């Protein structure tokens, strides 16, 4: 792996130290000012793999920088997210559970080699639409081809970026694919969208909520404490409601209290699990 002999970092927010402020995988913005809060390289929780020997902005084209700026502007406006995606730093990811990794898009076949060799990834769940892949100039065919060569199952469940209603509608099928891959037990599942800050965390939180005996807040806090991000909790609540109350006489979700379906009864969880598993292969 010629390019994968690159820098990688492992970190969590819990042990953040001032002397490591210059090592960055994400940038968060303080409410009052544009403080550049950097995440350190030497902590457990999040692993960020850089695709170049010297990641940074020096070798980034103006076109690429404009794309990142436009994308991060849209993310702030539509998701009210203080986080930023830096495509030029390469693929980054976080081990959420032993069987589950959440991250940004693989950018080249060498990233697939890295996931296989370093993280024992056996399944990749891609939540991007075709237009997302085209926007970032990713050669998906080469990535899928490398997955096949390495025996990695590549799955797609597209959802529209920055769109809670799209995420809500696609969550059941996406979680169905994720839960199936986990149940196969052949290796870790890598769930990604473009930045790994919205759709991929949302699907992973829904999976933990519906299948790991957690309420929504516990599942949400578990993920964001390891990977700082801003997935839409309302989309997960809405999808939970859609699955648990699948009847024509149900009251509109919009009329329910703000915290509705942040927890479910055991019988509702079993019903949701049955309905999600029934979506396998659809």
Curated annotation (Swiss-Prot):
E.C. numbers: 3.1.3.-
A single BP term in Gene Ontology: starch catabolic process
Motif (Glucan phosphatase signature motif CXAGXGR): 193-199
Tissue: Widely expressed.
Predominant localisation class: plastid
A Pfam family it matches: DSPc
Protein induction: Expressed with a circadian rhythm showing a peak at the end of the day and then decreasing to reach the lowest levels at the end of the night.
Impact reported for residue 83 to A: Decreases starch C3 dephosphorylation. No effect on phosphatase activity with p-nitrophenyl phosphate
Keywords for the protein's UniProt record, in alphabetical order: Carbohydrate metabolism, Chloroplast, Hydrolase, Plastid, Protein phosphatase, Transit peptide
Binding site residues for substrate: 83, 153-156, 161, 177-180, 194-199, 230, 245, 251, 259-263, 268
GO cellular component, one term: chloroplast
Effect the entry attributes to changing residue 85 to A: Nearly abolishes starch C3 dephosphorylation. No effect on phosphatase activity with p-nitrophenyl phosphate
S-adenosyl-L-methionine among keywords: no
Enzyme class per UniProt: hydrolase
Transit sequence range: 1-61
Catalytic residues in the record: 193 (phosphocysteine intermediate)
Primary role: Starch-associated phosphoglucan phosphatase that selectively dephosphorylates the glucan C3 position. Probably participates in the regulation of starch degradation.
Name this protein carries in UniProt: Phosphoglucan phosphatase LSF2, chloroplastic
Organismal lineage: Eukaryota, Viridiplantae, Streptophyta, Embryophyta, Tracheophyta
